[in-house]
C-alpha cells in the first residue's frame, strides 16, 4: 500500500458547484508542505452508499484518509456513521463532546436540540479531534492496521484551525513528513508566463531545488521548492536561486510569497515619505480598494475620486471640457489631466489615474473594449501609459488588470528614480 494521503470531501453542495471546494485546495497545499505524498482527491455527495464505495477504493491505495464535511447535526450529515458502518464498528457517545457542545450553545444564548447528540458519537476506538471554534468535532482513528482516518467539519475556518492545532502535530509525531517541502514563490507583473519561462529556462531544468512557472490572477509566478529537514536548510538552497532569478528578471519581479503590488508599492511610498491619490473611471474604486486593503495605508494613501461621469471629471478634477469633446474620456490627454487634477486637489506627491473601456459594450474600431490609459502626475510632471487588454475574460478582468497595471506603473517609476 502506498505511503500516501487521500482527500475525500463530502457534500452534495460541492458536487453541484454551489460551494467552492477550498478545503481540498488548503489540504493539498498543506500535505505538499509537509512532504506527505498525495495522489488522489474525491468529492462525494451526501449519500452513504457512494461514500462507502469511495472509502473502499481509497483504502486500497492510501494509508492516510482525510475527510471534510458531513459532521453536523442534520440528517444529511452522514460521514461519521457511514465510516463506522463501513468498518463494522459501533458508535460510542462521548460525554465530554456533548458537554462542550452544550457549553458553546449556552455561550450563544441557545440550548442544544436532540439532533445535536449525534455529534457526540464517534466510532469505537476513535480519538476526539477537538474543534475550538465550532460544535462539530472531528476524529483521529485507526480502524485498521497501517490506516489512519482524520475527519474535519466542512466549514473552512474550523477545519483549518483543527488542522493547524491538532492534526499537524499528530502527523509529525506519527512520522509523517519527516522531510518537509519548503517553497518560495516569486511574483511578476508585466510579463507573460511563457515569456518568463523562456527567460529562466535553465533554472527549470534543476532537479533540486525545483523551479516551476505558473500563472494566477493575471500575473506570472515561479515556485522554487526543495525538500529539507528544516527551514534554515531550505533557505540555504532556495535563496541563491531566487537571487539569480531576481537579477535576470529585473523590475518584472515585484515581490515574493504574500507580497502584492499594493503592499510593495506601499512600502516604497512609505520609505520615501511620499503620498498618493487616485482618480478612477472604469475601475470604479477598485484601485483604491487594493490600496486600502493594506493595513497602515493611510500613512501614504490619502484618498481618491471616482469620476465615472464626465461632469465629475470636469468639476472635481479640472479636466478640460474641450479635451473631452475633442479626444474623448478614454484618451491619454484625459488620463493625464485626471492625474494632475487629483494630485492638486488632494495635495499629494503622486496622482495616479485610470480611464478606459471595460466593456462589454462601448468599444469602437479605434477605441476597442480593453483600451485603458493610465496617467501619472508627480513632482517632475505628468505622463501616461496605454494598455490594450484582451476582452475575452470580461469586464471584471479588464478592471482588475487595469488597477494592477496602474500600481505596477508607479512601482516601476519609483524604483527607476532610486
From Swiss-Prot:
Signal peptide: none
SUPFAM superfamilies to which the protein is assigned, alphabetical: CinA-like, Molybdenum cofactor biosynthesis proteins
InterPro entries xref list: CinA (IPR050101), CinA-like_C (IPR036653), CinA_C (IPR008136), CinA_KH (IPR041424), Competence-induced_CinA (IPR008135), MoaB/Mog-like_dom_sf (IPR036425), MoaB/Mog_dom (IPR001453)
Protein name: CinA-like protein
Similarity comment text for this entry: Belongs to the CinA family.
Cross-referenced Gene3D superfamilies: CinA-like, MoaB/Mog-like domain
Highest taxon of source: Bacteria
Organism: Cyanothece sp. (strain PCC 7425 / ATCC 29141)
